[in-house]
């Protein structure tokens, strides 16, 4: 490239200064690159005329920023301006005079081009066939610069509500000249692209804010010479702050020219900010081999970084990576450099905060050594370090690097990796996430905290020495992850703690989605506000997973100790975990073994959690199914149940049996319990209706004369059913209306009538709930013979509607409905012993039966219930006793008492998912009742009674019957 000295005549300089000052003050447009054309002679690129040449052909530059604008083109502030081309702060940055503000402020402006701290330049023929740079020029003035580095004189660049788009990539112009009398023209291109929007080689503080957009930033370590600097008190410091803004990649090529093979899309050319994938850099940091370390800190808040971040470091010139002998004894004893190790190390610390997002790769190019004499390690190598002898055995992974690259994501920020990213440390905090798909990520350590996530998708690969999943964070490997020859997650140690989750949701027969030597499921030493110690979770979902690693938990069962807690192994019921251990023996020559290896495949205490729930599946699908196998008879690990899971009709939990863990069958699920309890609950409603009809007939034989009539009764009750399999609580409320008449027949007086009953039931147990509706039609009769023997009989038809709902163990709502029809009968016989004119004692016996026929139905969770013929018989022997108090011809009060033995015979079972399950309710019980009937007039009376029945599978805690009748 040619050196090009910018010489201007006094009149031109004065004019330029005046125009620049005026344009900046009035927010105008201006160009930094122009072409001065002599229309007679042709431009000769290799011998271009000097700027200011009268009648010359030359490219002219007018874009320097000075502290004192009388010296040049621009002052230090742009507001509302539009700039086309390159802005150079070279003379501003090299003016170290006292009270000189080394600062450039750009607000509310558009820079079509770039800002550089270097001398501006361009190429008229950038590359040859081999890609080598060819002809070009750089531009400078007569201004004197200080060539010494002044540490602390940091250039501040403030960019607010401004776009710097790196989109001025070339000066296009037409050169006119005479060929004889003929005027000819050539189209020329002067390539001025910087590759990024901001290109600085001075210590810099860059502040980008207020919806700004910058197409790339490149910071390099420029001149560090100052003969007065002889101590280690100096570092080259760069700071970038991006708030509410976007930094994208730039371009080294002319994107709107077909010369570089670029094509448009419907007339729209590419833009420098269009991220083209790995290799398209948005930020680069390049340290030189000076004596001083380069420290770079980048902070983004609510901002977007679209492009790669490249970090290049080499050894300081005073550091010896191989070591040397400092005292002449023939033994290497020092690496030189500064005493403070950190001053021998370049740094790039990139922090994304407040919902910021980065799409791109971390490009990492540093030097490293394992020959450490008087420096401490500062990084790990993804490979290994070896013995310095003929054996060359693996001894370590610790190295000393010339630079370290650390990435932190905070408060809901996101990094979508591309290409192959390498960093030293990666911390992901407070709901942030890293997504690795079709790319690779390597970091010495990866730490996730406070609900953050690392998602490894299709063709994503993550490599680290130690992965820590803390405080409800998640590392997820999903079915979309493509398995190849490499493991998609490789970590020497994985620690999952405090509710963190290693989530391996892969295809059922993927055996090694990740590889590790040690999987540690542990917990913190502090209990939550409920007194629980929250542990780490290893969740394999439905995978048939083989863990070729040691499973470790350092907790104890002793709740009085600070390390109380269990590791959690989670899976679905169709999953299976085989724990093989890492296969190591106590081999002290290997880094990953020696004293830290547990030898046995699993140690510690674990809870096993079954996460799925379903109504489908027979008992044989789940009962005693092996879900964990520890392939080590010496293992002392314990496994116990973390929960119960609804699987088919039953709940199941984990149970350890030796070195296996199986599904242990427990009680019915809430939804199965409700489904199987419905026939019994229907019977309870019908029994209340049967008792209501029975009360009507009993009352017709006592008190004032009853010639038949119309009656209406409320009935209700509460039931508790428990046969050892089903269990429920039921409330019933209903009403019956009837009409009957008295008929004198042969040797008996008859009451013949009909009734209709309507009832609602509410059955529940735990989360199970059934809403019941019942409609019943009755015909009934009673014959009272002259010898005081009586016989009561009834026939009925009932229809039951039942709507079922429940919540499964995984929180899923389930519902279903079923209808059934039933026929019933009742037969009662007894003898009235008269005690004087008013009292009576009536021994009796009765038998009743209800025969239900239900339909097949399926719940929303796929549990299938076959239609059931449910038969229920009740046998009762008892005695009634009462006394009538007559107050007048039309008024009387009859209180009465009932005591009976009841036997329910309901030996039934129902098919659920193909399994026969007992849902019959039977057994002996005692009935105790009290009641009264009061006649207000000859024709109008009221009655009430209450009963308790208990002792069988179904206890009737109470029932009540309140009614009125009108006698003909």
Swiss-Prot record:
Q: Please give the SMART domains that the UniProt record associates with this protein.
A: Autotransporter
Give the source species.
Escherichia coli (strain K12)
User: What is the name attached to this protein's record?
Assistant: Putative uncharacterized protein YaiT
User: From which residue to which does the signal peptide run?
Assistant: 1-27
Q: Where is the Autotransporter domain?
A: 703-968
Membrane-traversing stretches: none
InterPro entries named among the record's database cross-references: Autotransporte_beta, Autotransporte_beta_dom_sf, Autotransporter_adhesion, OM_autotransptr_brl_dom, Pectin_lyase_fold/virulence, Pertactin_central, Pertactin_virulence_factor
Q: Name one GO cellular component term.
A: outer membrane
Q: Does the keyword Signal apply?
A: yes
What keywords appear on the UniProt entry?
Signal
């Amino acid at each position: 490239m040619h050196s090009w000295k910018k010489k201007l005549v006094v009149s031109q300089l004065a004019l330029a200064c005046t125009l620049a000052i005026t344009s900046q003050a009035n927010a105008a447009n201006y160009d930094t690159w122009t072409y001065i054309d002599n229309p007679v002679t042709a431009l000769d690129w290799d011998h271009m005329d000097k700027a200011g040449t009268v009648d010359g052909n030359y490219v002219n530059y007018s874009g320097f920023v000075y502290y004192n604008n009388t010296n040049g083109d621009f002052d230090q502030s742009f507001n509302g301006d539009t700039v086309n081309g390159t802005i150079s702060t070279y003379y501003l940055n090299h003016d170290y005079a006292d009270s000189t503000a080394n600062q450039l402020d750009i607000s509310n402006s558009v820079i079509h081009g770039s800002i550089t701290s270097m001398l501006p330049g361009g190429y008229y023929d950038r590359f040859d066939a081999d890609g080598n740079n060819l002809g070009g020029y750089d531009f400078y003035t007569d201004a004197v610069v200080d060539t010494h580095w002044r540490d602390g004189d940091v250039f501040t660049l403030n960019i607010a509500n401004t776009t710097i788009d790196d989109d001025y990539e070339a000066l296009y112009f037409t050169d006119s000249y005479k060929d004889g009398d003929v005027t000819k023209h050539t189209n020329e291109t002067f390539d001025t692209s910087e590759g990024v929007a901001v290109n600085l080689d001075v210590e810099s503080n860059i502040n980008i804010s207020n919806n700004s957009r910058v197409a790339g930033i490149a910071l390099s370590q420029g001149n560090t010479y100052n003969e007065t600097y002889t101590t280690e008190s100096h570092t080259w410091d760069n700071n970038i702050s991006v708030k509410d803004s976007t930094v994208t990649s730039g371009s080294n090529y002319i994107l709107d020219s077909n010369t570089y093979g670029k094509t448009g899309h419907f007339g729209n050319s590419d833009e420098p900010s269009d991220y083209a994938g790995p290799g398209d850099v948005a930020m680069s940091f390049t340290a030189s081999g000076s004596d001083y370390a380069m420290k770079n800190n980048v902070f983004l808040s609510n901002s977007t970084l679209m492009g790669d971040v490249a970090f290049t470091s080499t050894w300081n010139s005073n550091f010896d990576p191989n070591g040397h002998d400092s005292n002449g004894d023939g033994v290497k004893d020092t690496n030189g450099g500064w005493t403070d190790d950190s001053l021998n190390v370049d740094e790039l610390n990139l922090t994304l905060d407040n919902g910021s997002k980065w799409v791109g790769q971390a490009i990492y190019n540093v030097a490293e050594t394992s020959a450490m004499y008087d420096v401490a390690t500062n990084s790990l190598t993804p490979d290994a370090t070896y013995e310095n002898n003929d054996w060359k055995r693996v001894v370590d992974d610790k190295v000393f690097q010339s630079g370290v690259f650390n990435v932190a994501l905070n408060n809901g920020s996101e990094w979508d990796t591309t290409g192959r990213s390498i960093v030293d440390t990666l911390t992901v905090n407070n709901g942030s996430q890293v997504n690795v798909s079709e790319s690779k990520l390597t970091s010495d350590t990866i730490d996730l905290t406070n609900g953050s996530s690392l998602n490894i998708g299709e063709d994503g690969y993550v490599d680290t020495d130690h992965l820590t999943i803390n405080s409800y964070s998640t590392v997820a490997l999903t079915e979309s992850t493509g398995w190849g020859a490499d493991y998609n997650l490789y970590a020497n140690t994985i620690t999952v703690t405090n509710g963190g989750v290693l989530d391996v949701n892969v295809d059922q027969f993927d055996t090694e989605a990740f590889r590790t030597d040690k999987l540690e499921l542990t917990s913190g030493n502090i209990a939550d506000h409920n007194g629980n110690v929250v542990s780490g979770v290893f969740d394999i979902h439905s995978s048939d997973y083989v863990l070729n690693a040691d499973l470790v938990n350092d907790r104890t069962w002793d709740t009085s100790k600070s390390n109380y807690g269990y590791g959690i192994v989670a899976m679905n019921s169709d999953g299976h975990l085989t724990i093989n251990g890492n296969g190591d023996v106590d081999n002290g020559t290997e880094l990953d073994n020696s004293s830290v290896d547990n030898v046995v495949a699993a140690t510690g205490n674990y809870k096993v959690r079954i996460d799925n729930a379903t109504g489908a599946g027979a008992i044989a699908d789940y009962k005693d199914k092996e879900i964990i196998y520890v392939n080590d008879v010496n293992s002392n690990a314990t496994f116990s149940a973390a929960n119960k899971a609804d699987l088919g009709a039953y709940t199941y939990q984990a149970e350890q049996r030796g070195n296996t863990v199986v599904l242990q069958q427990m009680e019915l699920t809430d939804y199965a319990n409700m489904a199987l309890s419905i026939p019994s609950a229907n019977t309870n409603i019908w029994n209340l209706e049967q008792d209501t009809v029975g009360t009507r007939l009993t009352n017709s034989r006592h008190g004032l004369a009853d010639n038949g009539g119309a009656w209406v009764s409320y009935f209700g009750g509460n039931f508790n059913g428990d046969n050892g399999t089903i269990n429920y609580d039921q409330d019933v409320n209903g009403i019956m209306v009837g009409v009957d008449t008295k008929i004198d027949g042969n040797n008996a007086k008859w009451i013949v009538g009909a009734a209709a009953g309507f009832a609602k039931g509410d059955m529940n147990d735990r989360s199970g709930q059934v809403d019941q509706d019942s409609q019943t039609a009755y015909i009934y009769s009673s014959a009272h013979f002259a010898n005081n023997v009586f016989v009561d009989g009834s026939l009925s038809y009932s229809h039951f509607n039942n709507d079922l709902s429940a919540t499964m163990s995984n929180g899923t709502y389930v519902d279903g409905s079923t209808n059934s029809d039933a026929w019933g009968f009742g037969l009662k016989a007894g003898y009235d012993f008269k005690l004087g004119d008013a009292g009576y004692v009536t021994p009796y016996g009765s038998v009743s039966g209800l025969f239900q026929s239900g339909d097949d139905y399926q719940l929303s969770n796929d549990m299938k219930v076959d239609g059931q013929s449910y038969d229920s018989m009740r046998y009762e022997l008892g005695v009634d006793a009462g006394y009538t108090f007559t107050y007048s011809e039309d008024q009387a009060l009859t209180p009465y008492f009932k005591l009976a033995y009841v036997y329910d015979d309901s030996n039934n079972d129902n098919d659920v998912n193909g399994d026969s399950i007992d849902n019959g309710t039977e057994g002996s019980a005692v009935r105790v009742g009290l009641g009264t009937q009061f006649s207000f007039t000859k024709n109008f009376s009221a009655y009430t009674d209450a009963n308790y029945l208990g002792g069988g599978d179904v206890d009737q805690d109470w029932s009540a019957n309140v009614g009125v009748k009108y006698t003909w």
